[in-house]
Curated annotation (Swiss-Prot):
This is Microtubule-associated protein VP6. Keywords: Capsid protein, Host cytoplasm, Host cytoskeleton, Inner capsid protein, Virion. It comes from Aedes pseudoscutellaris reovirus (isolate France). Signal peptide: none annotated. The lineage of its organism: Viruses, Riboviria, Orthornavirae, Duplornaviricota, Resentoviricetes. It is found in: Virion; Host cytoplasm, Host cytoskeleton.
Length: 540
């Protein structure tokens, strides 16, 4: 039973929670809900009686635990205890040395009320609890709205506390996930615009107006600000104000280091922002700078930092104790920062891991397919599956991935040629949904047919890895489904950075249309099924 009734929808909506339609609850959950509401009604009626709810706390505790109401014999007055008529008429309520309620005026009427309500606690061993628990959300706003007759029962009822963090109510909680809708974060690429990153300027969190900041740091009038604040604890991101395009990033690190960067551009500090910025599931605090609604993503508010830290520690332990090739897969959207993360790993390594680290680019397989499509000798093609070759072709922009070429060919079938015009934001915004759907369907059909060969590619790569006992192989992928073909491992991560993929793609100097379509397709194929890996959790 939730401490606040679901009819108080404004309380739950304030916390970002919206009730599932009761008729859509699964049968067991529906039974639990109906029992809880019946108990709530009993409590409401008892609270209106003489003496209020405090006299009746133990009585309510009993029925919430599935017991019939009972009365302690020793607590009865001498007169009542020896009243023959009373004992015969109310014997069903009395049990010698019971743990029931003490006698008070009106207790027998209360017991009659409970029995007449036909309240039955559902009890399916191993499936439904043997007692009805009080569900409380650990949030000041929620706690202060708990009705007084429920609040007074918290010390006698079995209580389940729902965690609340900076990201909101824990959606992983079993009671929250049963009764409330799963929230989504909404984005819209129709309102995007390309951003000149040389005009995006870092400023410290300040109350100064835009004009004052421009004057203080001698900036151009068209400068775009990104506020930042160094923190030791999680802070709530600020919102836009006064119609200006204003963003807020939460940073980790030494405040003096970041003070030195005030007035410098986002572009000049991109790598450090990427490493130390803490991604949040809030549209105004990621680095996309102009959008509304159309891209829908499931929001996760689980504590990413704790789960990720545990998994990274497990990886470090494997690298120390195992004498075989250790494999990790990192899944990230087109434009999410996979290449930047790979560059960081190659340059800085991973703290706590002394093994040689080899990173395989997410486009490596697609470019190898392009490189070998005209080679008849399969052995010659297999010889090109080696770390050095894959590294070189991944860096070579002149090699078009097999998958990118497929999109180009499909666009041509719709009479769309790649040009400066079709790569423009104006054209992308007007691209028909039917064309996107048709290309997406054919891409998935091709991808499925190609799946076996992709698996053989990674199998050969792992089987011919030099010095496997001292190597950590990190494979970057575009979508969750690719993990079935990629090197087998239980170390799968979903990349989560401060960059918003669509904005990153629209700011690219080449392949904007093709990458936009691939972004949409891979997003449909899934990218967020695994533990979220944030750069700020790797390099603290």
């Amino acid at each position: 039973m939730f401490a606040i009734p679901f009819t108080a929808s404004q309380v739950y909506s304030h916390l970002g929670l919206y009730l599932q339609p009761i008729e859509k609850l699964d049968p067991l959950t529906k039974v639990q809900y109906e029992s809880a509401e019946k108990l709530r009604d009993i409590i409401a009626q008892l609270s209106r009686r003489s003496g209020g709810i405090s006299l009746r706390k133990n009585l309510i505790r009993d029925i919430a635990c599935g017991h019939k109401p009972k009365l302690n014999i020793p607590s009865l007055t001498h007169q009542v205890r020896h009243n023959r008529e009373f004992k015969h008429g109310r014997s069903q309520f009395i049990l010698v040395d019971s743990n029931g309620s003490d006698y008070y005026d009106g207790i027998f009427d209360d017991m009659v009320l409970i029995l007449q309500s036909n309240f039955v606690l559902p009890n399916v061993p191993g499936i439904i609890s043997e007692q009805l628990r009080l569900i409380v959300i650990d949030n000041d706003f929620y706690l202060k709205h708990i009705p007084s007759e429920i609040a007074i029962l918290r010390d006698v009822l079995s209580e389940h506390m729902v965690k609340f963090s900076i990201d909101g109510v824990s959606l992983e909680d079993p009671f929250i996930s049963k009764f409330f809708r799963k929230p989504f974060v909404l984005y819209d690429h129709t309102k995007f615009k390309k951003i000149d990153l040389t005009k995006v300027v870092l400023i410290n969190k300040t109350g100064k107006s835009k004009a004052q900041v421009i004057d203080k740091y001698k900036l151009n009038d068209d400068a775009v600000f990104i506020n930042y604040e160094v923190f030791d604890v999680m802070l709530q991101p600020t919102k836009r104000r006064d119609g200006d395009i204003e963003q807020f990033i939460r940073m980790r690190g030494d405040i003096e280091t970041w003070k030195a960067k005030i007035g410098t551009t986002f572009e000049d500090n991109l790598l450090e922002l990427f490493v130390h910025g803490v991604p949040v599931m809030n549209s105004t605090s990621q680095l996309q700078l102009d959008f509304q609604i159309s891209d829908i993503r499931v929001a996760s508010v689980f504590d990413d930092q704790i789960v990720c830290a545990s998994k990274l520690n497990s990886l470090r332990e494997q690298c120390l104790t195992e004498s075989s090739l250790i494999r990790v897969n990192i899944i990230g959207q087109k434009g999410s920062g996979k290449s930047m993360l790979m560059k960081l790993i190659n340059e800085r390594g991973i703290p706590g891991i002394s093994r040689r680290i080899i990173c395989i680019d997410s486009d490596a397989y697609g470019k190898w397919r392009t490189q070998t499509q005209y080679i008849d000798n399969k052995f010659e093609a297999l010889k090109l599956i080696n770390v050095d070759n894959l590294y070189e072709i991944a860096r070579d922009d002149s090699v078009v991935s097999f998958y990118e070429q497929f999109i180009i060919d499909q666009l041509l079938s719709h009479n769309i040629e790649i040009s400066e015009h079709t790569n423009s934001l104006r054209f992308i915004k007007q691209l028909k949904v039917d064309i996107l759907k048709d290309i997406g369907r054919k891409f998935k059909e091709m991808y499925l047919a190609d799946f076996k060969e992709q698996g053989q590619f990674y199998e050969y790569l792992c089987g011919n890895m030099p010095e496997p006992s001292n190597t950590l192989l990190i494979t970057f992928l575009h979508a969750t489904v690719e993990t079935s073909a990629a090197p087998g491992t239980n170390m799968n991560f979903s990349l989560n950075t401060i960059l918003y993929p669509l904005q990153s793609i629209l700011n690219r100097k080449r392949g904007t249309l093709v990458n936009f379509i691939l972004n949409r397709i891979y997003d449909e194929m899934g990218t967020e099924a695994f533990t979220r890996l944030r750069p700020c959790d790797v390099w603290k």
